[in-house]
Amino acid sequence: MPRETYDRIFGVETEFGTLAEETLGTPEGVVEAIKDYLFYELKLGAIDLHARDDVFEPAASGGFLMNGARLYIDAVGSHLEYATAECRQLKDLVANDRAGQRQIVRAIKEIGVEDEVNVYNNSVDHFGGHTFGCHENYLVRADDDFLNNGVNQFYPFLVTRQIFAGVGRVGGHVLTNGPARPNYQEVLDNPVDYIWVSNVYGVEPDPYVQFQLSQRADHIIKTIASRVRFNRALINPKWEHFYSHDGMTRLHLLFGESNQNEFAYALKIGTTTLVIRALEDGLVPEEMVLWQPLIALREVSRDADYRWLVTMLDGRTISSVDLQRQYLKICADAYRGECAQTDWILSNWESILDGLETDPLTLGDRIDWVAKLKMVEEYRSEEGLDWTDDALHSVDLEYHNIDPDKSLFHAYQQMGQTTRLVSDLDIVTAMTDPPSDTRAYGRSKLVERVLARKGQKFYMFDWSGVALDRQSYIEMPDPFDRYEQPVDQWGKSSQGG
């Protein structure tokens, strides 16, 4: 398939929190039941027959779905995680992501436990101090110089994009020294005990914060880190085969959160793809570096006056809106007019920055934190509550309920108060159909054929290839390729055998 210069592969992984009535047993057991129903009853995917990780992803903990995505239970039953298919189009990504939520909701309803079980794409546990990741993946040039130098020009964008990408949060957390940091052997011997950063660092409520832009800003303690269980970072240098091919590899962004608003979700991913490209092309000035990225991250998130000032390495102070405008100008000057998707990103990036500069609170149709703040303020006013009341955390949480019949966000959306990118029909279609222009297409077709062959004793799916028996392996190294021919060839051989 011809590849245009502006093509970029991207995908998102979302960890879900689950609350269940005690009568159903543990949340872990409920999560297992949801996963089993999706694979064994609805047959929406091929369950793993092999362990991908002996501790965190044993055999049968999940698998690849017909829509090209992957659903699994991470960290030995702790939570459901959904990784979208590889996508090139923002609308495909939004639809594929929402389709995963609908699959989970469908399983809950058909099992008959919708009154007892709630699943959330909330990125923080207000009371336990845990966080749930929403990690972004981008195909980038495999260049060590990017990690050594380019990330310094990337951090200012990542730190300040929360002004339009943040989902909002009631309250805040303070990380303390907490329990003693475990030694390496202790972690090896007891890996499951150290899933949560709160087992290494103490987490306490911050009484001085009423509302902030980001759910995860308080929990980020490194700019870049490979051992992410102890070092919540902006970036995880996961140079591996997930999207790797032809001089390109995977960039794994850890600092993100689960947008309910489709517009905010797409703008977050879209602007990030353009900034990555500008960095690869050497267009971002070397002096565009923050003095202290992590301090700026928290200060922007907690600024109740919406000035969002950050300090650059050279001592200049600049607003986050103006800093974002600098990235916008770089990308617009270089890439405007090359395709409809790029122009959509650029025009809406500019529009949202204009709105943030004029009156942020008018942007509730496009920005999650604004919509959530309005809901919380309305509830607080009606009930006569102050900001310390735990009921406000419940409003925050229910904004992220993935069931459209329960979610405060979806109620807002059903009233026509949000800017949508996809239709409900698009989402339903994406529950079974993969993106048509990436390798997810070929992998999806192989999942379908494995499911059609009852009693298949052996298969092994991965992002970059599929083993159909112990003698054959279909390689899928290029994420841009649909891989139609290998699929067709296996179809013929399987019919003949």
What are these regions (language model features)?
Residues 1-121, 152-165, 205, 218, ...:
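Terminal catalytic/cofactor-binding subdomain
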Residues 109, 115-223:
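Internal, well-ordered domain-core segments that constitute the primary functional module
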